[in-house]
Every structure is written in C-alpha cells, then in structure tokens.
Curated annotation (Swiss-Prot):
HAMAP family: Hydroxyl_YbiX (MF_00657). Its EC number is 1.14.11.-. Its cofactor is Fe(2+); L-ascorbate. GO terms for molecular function: 2-oxoglutarate-dependent dioxygenase activity; iron ion binding; L-ascorbic acid binding. One of its GO terms (biological process) is DNA damage response. It holds the Pfam family 2OG-FeII_Oxy_3. This is PKHD-type hydroxylase PCC7424_1929. 2-oxoglutarate binds at residue 164. SMART domains: P4Hc. It comes from Gloeothece citriformis (strain PCC 7424). Keywords: Dioxygenase, Iron, Metal-binding, Oxidoreductase, Vitamin C.
C-alpha cells in the first residue's frame, strides 16, 4: 500500500529543521548505501552527530503521533533515518532497500520520504516507484510524507534545478506482510466510520473482534 501523509510536522518544527539543514554539514551519501546501491547513489547526507540525532527524534515523534501513519504502518521501530540533499545533477538510480539495517538488524518493512522542499523550488528529483508493469512518479508538497513498501524497486530522478531536501527512513512493522497491513487498515477505517455514524454497534464490536484477533495472529 502506497499512501501520503500530509502536514506531518508543526510549522515551527518544519521551519527549524529547514533552517538547521541550510547551515549543516553534509557528507557523501554513498557512505550509508549497500555495496550495490553505491553504484547508483549520487547525493549528500547530513553528517552523523548531535544535530542529526536531534532532527531524527523530531521526525520520529511527529510520525508516531500521526493517526494515519500509526493505523496504516503499525510501527514497532522507526529506524535508520537520514536527511538527504540532492543538488543539480544528483540522483539515485534504481535500487532496493536493504532488508535488514543497522547494528540491531532492524527489518525494513516500510519506507518513507518526508519532503522538506516545496515542488516549486526544484525541478526533477521525482521519486519513482516501479511496479511489475508500470511505474509512478511522486513529488509531494512540502511537509508531506510518502509511505511505501520497502520491497519495491525505486529511484530518484536527476535534479535539474534547485535543491531537493528530504528525510528518508524505514519502519519495522508489528505486521511484516504488506497485504495483512492493508487488511487491518481497511478494517480500522470501516470500524471508525461505523462509530462516527452509528456509535458502538454490534457491527462495530464484530470488526473490533476481528482486528484484535488478526493482530494476535499476525503481530510479532
């Protein structure tokens, strides 16, 4: 399931992050790529340290407070978050994200990209997600997040004007299978709609029972 989460950060948080990144030190993005992804990765990433840790926590906290993100992703652990910068000519060719990341070998079930530059401020730089028989390009509004399965091949097109700033990260979900997460999301959406329209009905209780039992069956 691919979906968008709009307006993730508070305006003050967004302004602070953009201001800090404007003056911060970036390093070669190849340093955090797998050996095969290094062949196609041409970008820069915020240097590890106190600033990176601070900004990472701000983004994590915002995502964990977001109801749509919680319901659709079922996060166990948000991990490996990076702040990436693409200048003119930079891109990230077709690649697959590593299945396990970091020293704790967190699983990457779900990937996300938080757009920190408005579309009008740069050209190119679309995030393209490849499917079995098609592909789709994404270039979201400032402060929006694109969430997609980590199992997909994807790429970032070359930036031809301006600068593209994003935060990218991964999630180990309580439910590793994408189709199972989608079933739970659909049931949760239906349950909430019933509650808004009719309150706590027998139908609401049946869906609640199914969600709870499926989580017992699928969660890990």
């Amino acid at each position: 399931m691919i979906f968008t989460v709009p307006t993730v950060l508070e305006p003050s948080q967004l302004e602070q992050i953009r201001s800090i990144l404007e003056k911060a030190e970036f390093v070669d993005g190849k340093l955090t790529a797998g050996w095969h992804a290094q062949l196609v990765k041409e970008n820069q990433q915020l240097k590890s340290g106190q600033i990176q840790t601070q900004l990472t926590q701000t983004v994590k906290d915002a995502l964990l407070k977001n109801a749509l993100f919680q319901t659709a992703v079922r996060p166990r652990k948000i991990h490996s978050l990076l702040f990436s910068r693409y200048e003119v000519g930079m891109s990230y060719g077709t690649h697959i994200d590593n299945g396990l990341m970091g020293s704790n070998f967190w699983r990457s079930d779900v990937s996300f990209t938080l757009f920190l530059t408005a579309p009008k401020d740069y050209e190119g730089g679309e995030l393209v997600i490849e499917g079995a028989d098609d592909e789709k390009a994404y270039k979201l509004d400032l402060n929006s997040v694109l969430v997609y399965p980590s199992s997909t091949l994807h790429r970032v097109e070359p930036v031809t004007k301006g600068t593209r700033l994003v935060a990218v990260g991964w999630v180990q979900s309580l439910v590793r299978d994408a189709s199972e997460r989608e079933i739970l999301f659909d049931l949760e959406t239906a349950r909430r709609a019933i509650f808004v329209q009719q309150g706590k009905t027998p139908e609401f209780d049946l869906i609640s029972k199914s969600i709870a039992n499926l989580l017992r069956k699928w969660a890990e």
